[in-house]
Amino acid sequence: MGFLSYFRSQKKRSASVAKERLQIIVARERSQTATGPDYLPMLKEELLDVIRKYVQVDRDAVNFQLDREGDCEVLELNITLPDQQDQAAAHDRG
């Protein structure tokens, strides 16, 4: 019986090692998604380009915020639009 218990104890050790490794992988994935997906900077630039096709806004007038709500991530986009008069003057100049 001592011989069999030796192998059983290794299974417990390998299970705990596997559990630790899985926890490390999960923690690493969570830390990477905490800063946002890899495509987020490019998405921001493309959205800014689309907005600028219709409204002349400064880069500082557009605010992007990535929030996590439970299992979902929400990309919030806030744009400070220029006044109608400012937009008309810019359109007349351009």
Swiss-Prot record:
**Which keywords has UniProt assigned to this entry?**
Cell cycle, Cell division
- Which Pfam families does this entry report, sorted A to Z? MinE
Which residue positions does the secretion signal occupy? none
Q: What InterPro entries does the annotation carry?
A: MinE (IPR005527), MinE_sf (IPR036707)
- Output the GO biological process annotations, alphabetical, semicolon-separated: cell division; regulation of division septum assembly
Q: Which domain of life is it from?
A: Bacteria
Q: Which HAMAP family match?
A: MinE (MF_00262)
The Swiss-Prot or TrEMBL record describes its family as follows: Belongs to the MinE family.
Known role: Prevents the cell division inhibition by proteins MinC and MinD at internal division sites while permitting inhibition at polar sites. This ensures cell division at the proper site by restricting the formation of a division septum at the midpoint of the long axis of the cell.
Name it: Cell division topological specificity factor
| Gene coding for it | minE
